[in-house]
Each structure stands twice: as C-alpha cells, then as structure tokens.
C-alpha cells in the first residue's frame, strides 16, 4: 500500500484564502510533485476527486481510482479545509501537511442469525464463531453463518467467553451466572464438530462476568460480581489445581467421569464492586487489566499477586480492550462515550481521547488485531460503530440491523465483525480485503 502526501500552503488575501496544494507520492519517486491551487472550502469528496485526477495526470502508468482519507496532524479530515483550520487553530501562514491514506473498506451486512435467547458473549477465530446465550448454550458457526454444533454448558446465562490459543486443538472457556467457568474442547471428526466439556472451574461466589486468557492458553483469569479476580491453571497437563473427585456413596469408589473440577491458583481482592471485563496485557505476560463498576481500571501483577496501579474514572465501566502493538486501552462505560487511555502516561490526563457518536451506554469495545488505529464499539443504541483513533468525532462506519440493545461484539478476524444482543440475533459484517 502506498501513501500520498500533500503540502498545503495558505495565505490570507483580500478576497479570501488562496491555498496551494503540492501533491507527491512517497512510494513512486518517479512521479514528479505537482502544485495546485484549491479553494479553502474544498470538501473531502472534492479533495478525493482532485487527488485522483492529479495522480492520473502525472502518473506515467494507468492509474486506478482510489478512495482516500486525508490526515492533517494525525487527524482525519471530516470537514472543509477552512473549518478544520479554524477549529484546530492552524496558523494560516504555515505549511499544512496532508497525508492521503486509502480508505478502510466498508463492512457489509453478511449473516443475520436468530437464536432462542439473548446473546451474552461472542468471540471469533480463523476457524469459527462462538456465541453464548442467556439460556446457557454455546453455539459454534462457520464464518458464513452455518451452524457447526451446540451444547448447553451452564445452568444459567453465559455472560462471557474466551478462545484459548492452542496450536494443537481448539479450547473454549465460558463463564456464567451459575458462578462457574466451564472449559471445553472443540473436537472435529470428519465433517462433524463437537463441544466436549473437560473441566469445571469452581471458586466464584456470584455471577462470572469477565474472562481473559494468556497468549499460550495456560493461564486464565476471571472476575465477577463477587469483586474477586481469580487466576486459573488451564494448562492441558495441569494436575496441581484439580479438586479431589467425589466418591460414590454406594461403592466408595471414584465416579467415572471425563469432567474434572479445578480450584483457582490464587484469588486477588482490590475492586470494590463487580469486575465486568478483563484483558491480558500485551506488554507483560504477568500483567492483567480489569475494569469494574467501582469506576476504576486496575492493573494487576500476577507474580506479585496484587494491584500495581489503579486508574480512576467518573463512570462505571462496562468493557475494556487493549491494542496488541501500542498497549493503549479503549473502554466503554455507562454513558455514550468510548475513551482512549494510555496507562503508561505520566503527563497530563490518562484519557487521551473521547469518541462521541453513540446515544446509549457502551456495552462492548474491541480493538482490531491487525491495524492499531482501528476499533469497534457496541451500544445499547442498537448500533456497532467502526472507529479510527484519528477521528474521534465521527466514526468511519455505522453498522446497523439490530432491533434492540447490543451486548457484545468481536473483531478478532480482520475481515469479519460480529455482534449479538437482546434481540436474540447474531449479525456478521464482512469487509472486502
């Protein structure tokens, strides 16, 4: 992918603004720079037409029309050039650099699948989509909406799930209102797929609301309404945290069962209200971040078995996601605002940006795993929005279709966005890559 850069020189004259645009392509040095004069009230659409026309004229090769976004000082241009200059207090005598980047492809509605109950959690990998319902059922689908298999794993609503990264096999951990976590294998025999529960993780005293797993799937953390963060050994070969099996009353022998019970490695306290979302830090294998209804983000060191930092907010949190490359955080709260945090910052406010666009509580946020500028947010306003961190006032796209509150979303696969909620439907949106 190549980038187009433009230098805009502005001078105030008696009749208004005279703006000169110098266009050149970084990746194609043989294309000479080209200077144009444009009006200051030029819009993004007209700037797109001008950029494409200019590139077509100055390129010695056949040029295919491209839709661009335009960056000024790391902010995507969404207004006229004049409005941007005035709003951002850009000196009109200065040289303004405009970077033209290829627009992200729009997600198109793909699958619309009805289930029997609310969808409380959803996750996706390169093989399947996993959706969990308030009826306690885990359902697996292929990327095109075909049902692969299902299994009722919990006695009450499933509130969270995570896919354990494992090169040999697929495993899923679910947490529910029944206070337990269930670890299951996904087995494939020929064209058939099965969900096989292998471990039940017991220790929480109230509903389990949050799950996160480390990069190799050997450790899992969970949190819930008991305010506790629990650490579990989910290594396939672990026997150290296996709880003693119950014995048969009649024979005095251990029951024959494929499902074992595990207890937590450690239980950590610190939050004053429910833990509702958790992520493993990409910067340290021993750090976990949690958000709570107590208005705080907690950073935990699992080796030290305690909190090492706490970030305070004015609202109760609902969701957190972390950028794999930068370590930046996005959070959802009980208001319509998505917030961007830099937990490593020691200067000024830790909230670096607020993203305005929703009109209901933010229920779920998810960072794109390929591009560090992109993320999605789901809301009680029935929409999923796709954002670029360089445009905090206008989302790139609105993904519509849900008829009631959205409870969960996922963007683990770059070309596929999935969501589910109170309308008992799972929706997928596909991007052409």
From Swiss-Prot:
Residues 21-102 are annotated as: Ubiquitin-like (UBL) domain. Keywords: Nucleus, Repeat, Ribosome biogenesis, rRNA processing, WD repeat. PROSITE patterns: WD_REPEATS_1, WD_REPEATS_2, WD_REPEATS_REGION. It is found in: Nucleus, Nucleolus; Nucleus, Nucleoplasm. GO terms for biological process: maturation of 5.8S rRNA from tricistronic rRNA transcript (SSU-rRNA, 5.8S rRNA, LSU-rRNA); maturation of LSU-rRNA from tricistronic rRNA transcript (SSU-rRNA, 5.8S rRNA, LSU-rRNA). GO terms for molecular function: ribonucleoprotein complex binding. The keyword rRNA processing applies. InterPro entries: G-protein_beta_WD-40_rep (IPR020472), NLE (IPR012972), WD40/YVTN_repeat-like_dom_sf (IPR015943), WD40_repeat_CS (IPR019775), WD40_repeat_dom_sf (IPR036322), WD40_rpt (IPR001680), WDR12/Ytm1 (IPR028599). GO terms for cellular component: nucleoplasm; PeBoW complex; preribosome, large subunit precursor. WD repeats lie at residues 114-151, 153-194, 203-242, 270-310, 312-351, 357-397, 401-433. Required for maturation of ribosomal RNAs and formation of the large ribosomal subunit. PANTHER family: RIBOSOME BIOGENESIS PROTEIN WDR12, WD40 REPEAT PROTEIN 12, 37. Belongs to the WD repeat WDR12/YTM1 family. This is Ribosome biogenesis protein WDR12 homolog. It comes from Brugia malayi (Filarial nematode worm).
């Amino acid at each position: 992918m190549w980038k187009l850069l433009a230098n805009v020189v502005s001078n105030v004259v008696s009749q208004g603004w005279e703006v000169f645009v110098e266009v050149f392509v970084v990746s194609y040095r043989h294309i000479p720079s080209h200077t144009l004069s444009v009006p200051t009230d030029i819009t993004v659409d007209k700037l797109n037409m001008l950029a494409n026309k200019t590139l077509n004229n100055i390129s010695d090769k056949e040029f295919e029309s491209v839709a661009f976004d335009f960056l000024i000082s790391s902010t995507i241009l969404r207004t006229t050039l004049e409005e941007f200059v005035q709003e951002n207090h850009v000196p009109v005598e200065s040289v303004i650099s405009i970077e033209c980047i290829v627009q992200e492809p729009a997600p198109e509605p793909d699958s619309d699948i009805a289930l029997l109950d609310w969808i409380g959690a959803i996750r996706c990998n390169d093989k399947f989509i996993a959706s969990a319902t308030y009826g306690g059922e885990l359902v697996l689908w292929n990327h095109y909406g075909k049902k692969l298999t299902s299994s009722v794993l919990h006695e009450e609503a499933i509130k969270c799930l995570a896919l354990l990264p494992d090169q040999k096999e697929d495993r899923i951990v679910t947490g529910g209102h029944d206070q337990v976590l269930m670890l299951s294998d996904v087995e494939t025999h020929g064209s058939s797929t099965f969900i096989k529960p292998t471990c039940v993780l017991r220790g929480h005293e109230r509903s389990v609301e949050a799950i996160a797993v480390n990069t190799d799937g050997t450790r899992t953390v969970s949190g819930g309404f008991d305010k506790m963060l629990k650490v579990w050994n989910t290594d396939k070969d672990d026997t150290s945290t296996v709880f003693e099996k119950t014995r048969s009353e009649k024979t005095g022998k251990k029951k024959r069962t494929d499902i074992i019970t595990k207890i937590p490695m450690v239980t950590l306290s610190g939050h004053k209200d429910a833990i509702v979302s958790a992520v493993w830090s990409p910067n340290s294998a021993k750090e976990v971040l949690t958000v709570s209804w107590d208005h705080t983000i907690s950073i935990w060191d699992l080796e030290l078995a305690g909190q090492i930092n706490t970030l305070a907010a004015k609202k109760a949190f609902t969701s957190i996601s972390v950028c794999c490359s930068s370590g930046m955080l996005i959070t959802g709260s009980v208001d319509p605002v998505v917030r961007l945090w830099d937990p490593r910052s020691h200067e000024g406010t830790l909230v670096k940006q607020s993203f305005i666009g929703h009109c209901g509580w933010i229920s779920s946020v998810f960072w794109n795993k390929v591009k560090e500028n992109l993320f999605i947010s789901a809301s009680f306003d029935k929409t999923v929005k796709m954002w670029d961190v360089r445009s905090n006032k206008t989302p790139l796209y609105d993904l519509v279709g849900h008829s009631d509150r959205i409870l969960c979303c996922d963007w683990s696969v770059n070309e596929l966005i999935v969501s589910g909620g109170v309308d008992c439907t799972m929706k997928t949106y596909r991007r052409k890559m």
